[in-house]
Amino acid sequence: MISISFNGIDPLFMYTQLLKETFLEINDDDTKSIKEFVDYCRLQGDITENHIDKIEKDYRLHTPIWWYTGPYFIYSMVNRGLRLMDVDIILKMGFFIRHLHQHIENLHREQQSTDTTSGTPFQVFRGQSLSIENFEKMKQTKGGLMSFNNFLSTSRDRNFSLEIFARPAALIDSSSVGILFVMVIDPMLCETSSTPFADVQQESFFEDQEQEILFSTHTIFRIDQIEHIHDDHTNRLWQVDLTLT
């Protein structure tokens, strides 16, 4: 589950924004940082040694997006650290968080300059579960701002996001609801946004799998509309319309 904070309600909102600015500005020695990271991973006891060895030997042979989307522990560890605000993990993975952010930023710049339709607004989708507590916070913040405190994977395919993620999330846990986020992205307005996004289909470990658009960490959206989705299987399915700020 992606961590979310709400402006005006959640003190975590401003704290996470300041944290993002801080760790993106730090410049570490990459060689030293990678060594410290793999040493840290070996102490955890629940990470496959072969995966650690591969990162140690081959990290520079692949892009950060390739590592992030691959069948390794990078994805789960970095998002667990950001979700739980685990300072240990964030510090050990600071080099990777910066590399991934910079890779998304560079792709965003390239795609905006070469895509002839880049000025046209478009929609992306994300299905996930949300605790009832956070859903109530979201309803209180309608018209305000919310932040996704992790790197954010979205899809251009609405049905994929609804059928594979949002509906199952509504059915699995009675203490949560299933959410289909519908995000409107206006590239012209996004020039002032501090959070880049990019189409990563060609960069992903699994190419062309789900028409994925990846946003950097701590992306801020405005909550425009919250409405119930009529569904034959559950009454705990909601659509939330967002606009990237």
Please place each PLM-identified region on the residue numbering.
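Mono-ADP-ribosyltransferase
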Residues: 1-245
